[in-house]
UniProtKB/Swiss-Prot annotation:
It is an enzyme of class 2 (transferase). It comes from the Bacteria. This is Ribose-phosphate pyrophosphokinase 1. InterPro entries: PRib_PP_synth_CS (IPR000842), Pribosyltran_N (IPR029099), PRibTrfase_dom (IPR000836), PRTase-like (IPR029057), Rib-P_diPkinase (IPR005946), Rib-P_diPkinase_bac (IPR037515). The lineage of its organism: Bacteria, Bacillati, Bacillota, Bacilli, Lactobacillales. It comes from Streptococcus mutans serotype c (strain ATCC 700610 / UA159).
Length: 322
């Protein structure tokens, strides 16, 4: 099928993924340049006509978070002024998602602010993967397509025979139970939950309190939406090992991996950490314990279905990628 009126542009954060998606769809990446003035000010130039086209921008708001967000906003403004028919943002990793509520007095709800900024800039639709808090979809007055990474993670483990009653899918906290239950459904395993208490006065840290469920003599598969400093996932893995788990694997959609993350992973009971490529990882972060799998097919199919006005519901099923 011809996609002559479909354009896909990459900015700075996910160029390799964007190239793979464009190739899978059967189109060329749109021609554009992003540069910074000496004071850090961002300028975007679109180097081809997009008048009347349906345009998709692929960019995660990963580090540097603020630069990547500004690139999106400026690019959207440029596309709108150049008479694009529609502008959709494909944001595999939605930054600022952890600031989705007021945990303490006088705190902002920055997730809502970012949603407002995208809408005011002129975004017609947002496509993202595994929001840290699903209710962020409700911050938008435009359509939000919220894809799941669990089918891809399930495919990884099923292909290695890691499914059934000898395995347990573990949520590292109560907030991730729905995600863990979905993966457990795909892998046909029971689930367990780590009961933890987070120290609100110290960022990126949490304390493991208790394990709800039987993990003794089982291979455990931890699943989370993101891993930042890896303190939570490393402590959870160690707690599972102490509780009698025979092996501990971990998985996440978004490998933020900042600060001491690599040391925490390397020194933990985790045998293998499976991550998606919603965030580009430099070679030095791809240590032996980390294996990255691609969301290329998921994003490509989603873009095609949006462009052709077909439902995205099949993308939520494990059989789509099996």
């Amino acid at each position: 099928m011809s996609y002559s009126n479909l354009k896909l542009f990459a900015l700075s954060s996910n160029k390799e993924l964007a190239e793979k998606v464009a190739k899978t769809i059967g189109i060329s990446l749109g021609k554009s340049t992003v540069r910074q003035f000496s004071d850090g000010e961002i300028q975007v130039n679109i180097e081809e006509s997009i008048r009347g086209n349906h345009v998709f921008i692929l960019q995660s708001t990963s580090s540097p978070v603020n630069d990547n967000l500004m690139e999106i906003l400026i690019m959207v403004d440029a596309l709108k002024r150049a008479s694009a028919e529609t502008v959709s943002v494909v944001m595999p990793y939605y930054g600022y998602a952890r600031q989705d509520r007021k945990a303490r007095s006088r705190e902002p709800i920055t997730s809502k602010l970012v949603a407002n900024m995208l809408a005011v800039a002129g975004v017609d639709r947002l496509l993202t993967v595994d929001l840290h808090a699903a209710q962020i979809q409700g911050f938008f007055d435009i359509p939000v397509d919220h894809l799941m990474g669990a089918p891809l993670i399930a495919d990884y483990f099923v292909r290695r025979g890691m499914c059934g009653s000898d395995y347990v899918v573990v949520s590292p906290d109560h907030g991730g139970v729905t995600r863990a239950r979905k993966l457990a459904q795909f892998l046909q395993t029971p689930i367990a939950i780590i009961d933890k208490r987070r120290n609100v006065n110290k960022m990126n840290t949490s304390e493991v309190m208790n394990i709800i469920g039987n993990v003794s003599g089982k291979t455990c598969i931890l699943i989370d939406d993101m891993i930042d400093t890896a303190g939570t996932i490393a402590h959870a893995a160690d707690a599972l090992a102490e509780a009698g788990a025979t092996a501990v694997y971990a998985s996440c959609t978004h490998p933020v991996l900042s600060g001491s993350a690599l040391d925490n992973i390397q020194n933990s009971a985790i045998e293998k950490l499976v991550v998606l490529d919603t965030i580009d990882l430099p070679e030095e972060k791809l240590i032996d314990k980390i294996e990255q799998i691609s969301i290329t097919d998921l994003i490509s199919e989603a873009i095609i279905r949006i462009h052709e006005k077909r439902p995205l519901s099949p993308l939520f099923e494990f059989t789509t990628f099996n």
